[in-house]
Amino acid sequence: MSGVNRRDFLTAGSAFLSLAAEAELLAGPVPAGMVEEGKADQIGPDVYFHEGQVGDNSDAVCNNGWIIFEDYVLVIDANFPAGARLIISKIRSMTDKPIRFAFDTHHHGDHAYGNQVYVENGAVPVAHTGVIEEMKRHETGYYGGKPGAWEDAAKGRADVRDSKLKPPSVLFSKDLYFDDGKHRVELLHLGVAHTHGDALAWLPKERVLFTGDVCVNGPYNFVGDGDVGKWVVTLDAVKKLRPKIVGTGHGPRSVATVLDDQQAFFKSLRDEVGSLMANKSPDEAKGQVEGIRATLKGNAQIARYVSDQGAGDSFPSQVGKVYEELTGKKLAALSDHRRLARHAHARCHGLELA
């Protein structure tokens, strides 16, 4: 892989974990929508996908994956604490092999707050170094400052209140490989997208890709902690992997075309905001939001990414984020981060509330 300067090995049972960059030990495809909700769906030999459910009261909010190696299990995303317990129970119904690693694709609560549950069950949390950087920015309560994202999430989730934040303890700066000769999983950081610490899990033998929220399948894109322009570029790098099966961060699993669809949504959003809003003042620009929504809704390829008006409507905040990236100006009510967190999906991500 690119950027490989050295190779280290950590023993995991009788298997080996190879670190292909600077790793640090610090503390048959089914069409989208055809997977039974809550079911552990086998997508390859010893490879499973579980579709979560976006909602304030859901146990498993994000999608999960897991790979059963010869001597241990690697889980993709820790989920919330309740989701972690649910996924562990599903794994235990299949195998008694130890769960050694829980890989956080990024720092948001629905992907990382279950780390402590995995630690209690013998696993080590793993993530890109950017996850720690983001946690230091948003988890201020854990790092000795004012209450942060964890404390806000705890207000609405008993499972968070009853657990504690556990940052990942195995970190990598570019890529990290798990390979026991039978299975190979490559954890890859390909650029800024949904956050500044996103990483993916790539299974080259099976051509299965777990994207975290770098790619979702539905109206689930939260843009407050990332960069939409860079996200488009990162998706170019992701598409070069040419996966056959894509386990998205939210929504049904799919095939490689879901990467095209996600990218097309952001490209269209940037094009529309650029042409209709970029030369307008913030007050004038706000009036263009619903017209842009209608235009994108009219595009069959990307319509499912556009949220409807109502309590969980994230589209105005997406417009506001792109407007700010293009102009350097905020559309106050549309782009304020603390207001973004009031949206249902932002709450599910464990983001701060005002």
PLM regions: where:
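C-terminal regulatory/interaction regions
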Residues: 10, 282-354
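Divalent-metal (often Zn2+) His-rich catalytic cores of metallo-beta-lactamase-fold enzymes
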Residues: 202, 208, 230-288
